[in-house]
């Protein structure tokens, strides 16, 4: 048995300490503080690999600072069951509300228009002239023979396809075959209304399915890449077509009318979210400052940038304003409480080599670090945070005590000393995968309007997803729906990154509570999925909620007639008693297994360890290290 765990190995291991089950009052219903309707299992993480946290959230866990918790939805005392919700961004279909949010935001940035209905009265002479010119051009184009235009369009699209990072590796003969088969065709009259005048089949890629599978590339991804690059690099008005993803591996070409052309020529480029998916470009714009740009000079400057998690005076002041006005919290906030909730993170960071490591990792200090004794003394009781993103907020006494035990020593200062810069992340599930910019780990996104900080998004970037932790904003800009806009921005980031890192395609929105009205907004990002907490299978949102009735708050979502139902009722430990010996323990400089513990201590420890095994599952039982302080 290996009794000593070397530091190099320890630096890539997850160290946790389970605290068991606890109950607390619920923030999502009117049950009252006396009713303990929220039942969870919790543990503290000193350090946690991004892959291990990905596995945890795929079993219903979430984090609040360094505290990890998993709601027990099946407990009869649970009043508001919480289900993990995620969106596959490759299939994202913007709703009417999503589109309205972007339009409203763009109107303000471009024209300083706050109400959409005012836009019709703000047209300038220049706008009218442009409209006239466009109508004239459209008429002339319609009188032309389209052959030359379509051939040029076809060539431009083939060039985009061949520039795909994966396709670019094809030999010249295969590229020639692609060129010969990727031909735009005229649709029949009965199909024009549904599919547009022209279409392009990508069926030729079925010939290369083995190569695609080998590199985890799908035909859908190639189509999405083509549409994205076309919209990004080619002026649609040159061709008068919109490209849309069709059925059976096709791209459809639909004519643009004059009002659409005018709208496209003046719209902001801040968000480029695609309907029906996006594996998107290989660029990662959010790692650098993203500025709104248009053909006309915008009335406002809008920027998004990613930073290390920090508690500056500017950030903390915005947080206090948000909590007071939006959540009606009049109690005084402290920096130390804010740090424990939204700055401290157990995730071991992997920073992209193109980024400055110091720019993105929290070093235990802050730019305005006068985090004086007053903060530490006053923070014996943590703040109540009622989170829009429904994260656990440290608002029950057990969690306050547990989290406070860990804030003093290792987490703030050592977690980033063991992180590193790397172009890749080695994972058990996918092997070696690329590192996105800025990296894997926990980050803050700053939203600035004319230089003023108006929003902060707290996010975790993991091997398969961007997980939204919390978002707070300046209530003075409530009219911009910044909460909704930030979600769309995060979805777009995932869409772009997934083009070069295919498995990183999900957007996690925390928990969904069907009985809670303020959770309904999460249903606006479709097609989303809910996690079945008995099988850990993802189920399409509408199908999942069909099992939830007013008199049935909790339900299993996934059913398989071929499965052994009796076996499902067994716990992980009952199925695999040998897992007890697979648990790795660590105390001081020693690592050991259950059989190495004295019989007396085994008797004291056994029930706690079995409970832990049943909550983290077989794979994490073997990976996490049960850490005794």
UniProtKB/Swiss-Prot annotation:
<dbReference type="GO" id="GO:0005634">
    <property type="term" value="C:nucleus"/>
</dbReference>
<dbReference type="GO" id="GO:0036211">
    <property type="term" value="P:protein modification process"/>
</dbReference>
<dbReference type="GO" id="GO:0016477">
    <property type="term" value="P:cell migration"/>
</dbReference>
<comment type="similarity">
    <text>Belongs to the R-transferase family.</text>
</comment>
<dbReference type="GO" id="GO:0010498">
    <property type="term" value="P:proteasomal protein catabolic process"/>
</dbReference>
<keyword id="KW-0833">Ubl conjugation pathway</keyword>
<feature type="compositionally biased region" description="Low complexity">
    <location>
        <begin position="282"/>
        <end position="295"/>
    </location>
</feature>
<protein>
    <recommendedName>
        <fullName>Arginyl-tRNA--protein transferase 1</fullName>
        <ecNumber>2.3.2.8</ecNumber>
    </recommendedName>
</protein>
<dbReference type="GO" id="GO:0031589">
    <property type="term" value="P:cell-substrate adhesion"/>
</dbReference>
<feature type="compositionally biased region" description="Acidic residues">
    <location>
        <begin position="356"/>
        <end position="396"/>
    </location>
</feature>
<keyword id="KW-0012">Acyltransferase</keyword>
<dbReference type="InterPro" id="IPR007471">
    <property type="entry name" value="N-end_Aminoacyl_Trfase_N"/>
</dbReference>
<feature type="region of interest" description="Disordered">
    <location>
        <begin position="274"/>
        <end position="298"/>
    </location>
</feature>
<dbReference type="GO" id="GO:0004057">
    <property type="term" value="F:arginyl-tRNA--protein transferase activity"/>
</dbReference>
<dbReference type="InterPro" id="IPR017137">
    <property type="entry name" value="Arg-tRNA-P_Trfase_1_euk"/>
</dbReference>
<dbReference type="GO" id="GO:0005737">
    <property type="term" value="C:cytoplasm"/>
</dbReference>
<feature type="region of interest" description="Disordered">
    <location>
        <begin position="353"/>
        <end position="405"/>
    </location>
</feature>
<dbReference type="Pfam" id="PF04377">
    <property type="entry name" value="ATE_C"/>
</dbReference>
<comment type="function">
    <text>Involved in the post-translational conjugation of arginine to the N-terminal aspartate or glutamate of a protein. This arginylation is required for degradation of the protein via the ubiquitin pathway. Does not arginylate cysteine residues.</text>
</comment>
<dbReference type="InterPro" id="IPR016181">
    <property type="entry name" value="Acyl_CoA_acyltransferase"/>
</dbReference>
<dbReference type="Pfam" id="PF04376">
    <property type="entry name" value="ATE_N"/>
</dbReference>
<keyword id="KW-0808">Transferase</keyword>
<dbReference type="GO" id="GO:0005829">
    <property type="term" value="C:cytosol"/>
</dbReference>
<dbReference type="InterPro" id="IPR007472">
    <property type="entry name" value="N-end_Aminoacyl_Trfase_C"/>
</dbReference>
<dbReference type="GO" id="GO:0031143">
    <property type="term" value="C:pseudopodium"/>
</dbReference>
<dbReference type="InterPro" id="IPR030700">
    <property type="entry name" value="N-end_Aminoacyl_Trfase"/>
</dbReference>
């Amino acid at each position: 048995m290996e009794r000593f765990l070397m530091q190099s190995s320890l630096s890539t291991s997850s160290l946790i300490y389970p605290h068991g089950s606890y109950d607390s009052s619920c923030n999502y219903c009117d049950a009252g503080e006396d009713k303990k309707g929220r039942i969870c299992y919790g543990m503290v993480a000193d350090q946690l690999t991004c892959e291990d946290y990905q596995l945890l959230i795929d079993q219903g866990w979430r984090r609040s600072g360094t505290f990890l918790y998993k709601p027990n939805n099946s407990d009869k005392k649970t009043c508001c069951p919480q289900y993990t919700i995620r969106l596959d961004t490759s299939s994202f279909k913007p709703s009417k509300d999503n589109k309205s949010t972007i339009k409203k935001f763009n109107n303000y940035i471009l024209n300083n228009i706050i109400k959409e209905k005012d836009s019709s009265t703000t047209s300038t002479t220049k706008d009218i002239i442009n409209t006239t010119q466009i109508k004239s051009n459209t008429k002339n184009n319609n009188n032309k023979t389209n052959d030359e235009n379509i051939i040029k369009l076809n060539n431009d699209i083939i060039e985009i396809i061949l520039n795909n990072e994966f396709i670019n590796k094809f030999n010249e003969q295969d590229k020639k075959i692609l060129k010969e088969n990727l031909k735009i065709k005229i649709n029949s009259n009965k199909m024009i209304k549904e599919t547009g005048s022209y279409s392009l089949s990508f069926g030729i890629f079925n010939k290369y399915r083995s190569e695609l599978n080998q590199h985890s590339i799908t035909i859908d991804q190639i189509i999405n890449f083509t549409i994205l690059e076309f919209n990004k690099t080619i002026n649609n008005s040159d061709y008068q077509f919109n490209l849309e993803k069709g059925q059976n591996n096709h791209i459809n070409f639909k004519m643009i009318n004059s009002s659409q052309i005018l709208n496209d020529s003046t719209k902001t480029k801040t968000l480029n979210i695609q309907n029906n998916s996006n594996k998107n470009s290989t660029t990662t714009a959010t790692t650098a400052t993203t500025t709104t740009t248009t053909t006309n000079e915008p009335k406002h400057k809008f920027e998004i940038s990613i930073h290390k998690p920090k508690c500056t005076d500017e950030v903390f002041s915005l947080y206090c304003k948000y909590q007071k006005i939006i959540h009606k919290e009049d109690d005084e906030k402290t920096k130390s409480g804010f740090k424990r909730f939204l700055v401290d993170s157990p995730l071991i960071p992997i920073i992209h080599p193109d980024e400055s490591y110091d720019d993105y990792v929290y070093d235990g200090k802050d730019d305005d670090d006068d985090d004086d004794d007053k903060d530490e003394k006053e923070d014996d009781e943590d703040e109540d945070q009622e989170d829009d993103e429904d994260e656990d907020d440290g608002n029950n006494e057990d969690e306050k005590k547990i989290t406070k035990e860990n804030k003093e020593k290792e987490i703030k200062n050592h977690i980033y000393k063991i992180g590193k810069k790397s172009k890749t992340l080695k994972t058990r599930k996918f092997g070696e995968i690329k590192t996105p910019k800025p990296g894997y780990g926990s980050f803050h996104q700053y939203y600035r309007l004319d230089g003023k900080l108006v929003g902060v998004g707290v996010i975790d970037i993991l091997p398969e997803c961007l997980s939204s932790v919390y978002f707070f904003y300046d209530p003075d800009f409530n009219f911009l729906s910044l909460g909704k806009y930030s979600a769309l921005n995060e979805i777009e980031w995932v869409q772009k990154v997934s083009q070069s890192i295919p498995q990183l395609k999900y957007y996690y929105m925390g928990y969904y509570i069907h009985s809670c009205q303020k959770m309904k907004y999460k249903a606006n990002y479709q097609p989303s999925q809910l996690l079945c907490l008995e099988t850990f299978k993802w189920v399409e949102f509408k199908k999942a909620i069909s099992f939830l009735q007013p008199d049935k708050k909790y339900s299993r979502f996934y059913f398989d007639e071929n499965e052994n139902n009796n076996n499902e009722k067994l716990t992980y430990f009952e199925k695999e008693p040998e897992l007890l010996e697979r648990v790795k323990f660590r105390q001081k400089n020693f690592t050991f297994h259950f059989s190495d513990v004295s019989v007396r201590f085994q008797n004291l420890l056994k029930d706690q360890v079995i409970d832990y095994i049943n909550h983290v599952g077989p794979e994490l039982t073997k990976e996490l290290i049960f850490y005794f302080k």
